[in-house]
Structures are given as structure tokens and as C-alpha cells.
Amino acid sequence: GSRFISKRINQFLAEFQGEFWVVEQSQNAVDPNHHTQTRFNAKAHHWLRAHPPLRQKPWLLEPLALSKFCATFIEQQVGGNLNEASLAHHIERVLPYNGILFLGNSLFVRLVDALTKLPEGYPIYTNRGASGIDGLLATAAGIGIGADQPVVAMIGDTSTLYDLNSLALFKNVTQPTIIFVINNNGGAIFDM
């Protein structure tokens, strides 16, 4: 699909010299690193049905073991403390079945990316906005209205303050909505 939002994955892909396969429904080529690639214009689920997974290769065992080690290490470090890292790490515990997750500030998006393993296929939305903090409550309400599914929204304190008027939009949401406001002093964006 399109470009990843993860800074670490984008850095890895920028330096990667191997073969790229891109499965993208759109005809538009998104290739910021100008790598040679094989493109498949198809819906991802159609392509996956036509191309069953390859058997696990021996070289994959080491990264899988490292991944398990990292998951255990993160659990030990984050543990039961109540802070941004623990909320990001344990976020899957509050996700409703057949719901949607909305992540609404850049620091928390990065923490979820680094510290948690979300259920496979669980829909996740985010919106950076023009300034990175505007319109996030409105976006979460719009997702709830459009999808007609339960929504869990994680939004930073400054982002919430900038969009308080959009709370009125939630009167049009028919499914349960949980809004977590992360009190993190603006995610330290003003400390630079």
C-alpha cells in the first residue's frame, strides 16, 4: 500500500537494497526512495488470496526470536505503571470487538507503533491535520459516523483543547465511543 507513517520503517526502507513488491489498489506510484519495485495493482485481500504465504525460511527464526525477546523486555519495562508507554502497550485490552482505533497525536502514534502488537486486521485511523493537532475530535466523530462501529480514540491534551467544539459532533455518533485524553503536556512538542 501507500507510504508507512512509521519513521523507523521508512528509514529501514530508505536503506534497504533488496527487492520490493508493492500491492496497491491505486494506479499512483508512491515511491519516495526511488527503489526499483514490482507493482501489483490489486486490492490487498484479493492479491493475498491468489498468493498464499511462503513457507517459513530458516533465516526468519532469528528475527522471530528477537521479536519475542523484545516483547518480553517491553512488558517488563512498562509493567503495570500508568503512563503513556503503558497505555500504548496495553491498548489492545480496551479495544471493542468489531471496533475502530483512532490515534490522534504524533507522540502516541509513535508509542503504539513501538510498544504494542495490535490485533491483526484491526482498523486504525489517524489524522495529522494542518498543524498536527487540529481537528482530531472531529475526525474521530466522522469515523464513528461513517463506519457506524464503536470507536476508541486516543487524543493528546493539546489536540483535545484545540478541537473542543467538535465534541458537539458526537451527538450524531450512534455507536459507543471512548475518548482517552492523554495528559502529557502537549507531548513535549513545546519543549524544543
Per-range role (PLM):
Residues 116-192:
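Thiamine diphosphate
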Residues 104-122:
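Acidic-glycine-rich active-site phosphate/pyrophosphate-binding loop
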Residues 5-10, 30-33, 50, 111-113, ...:
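Short helix/loop capping segments that flank catalytic or ligand/cofactor-binding pockets
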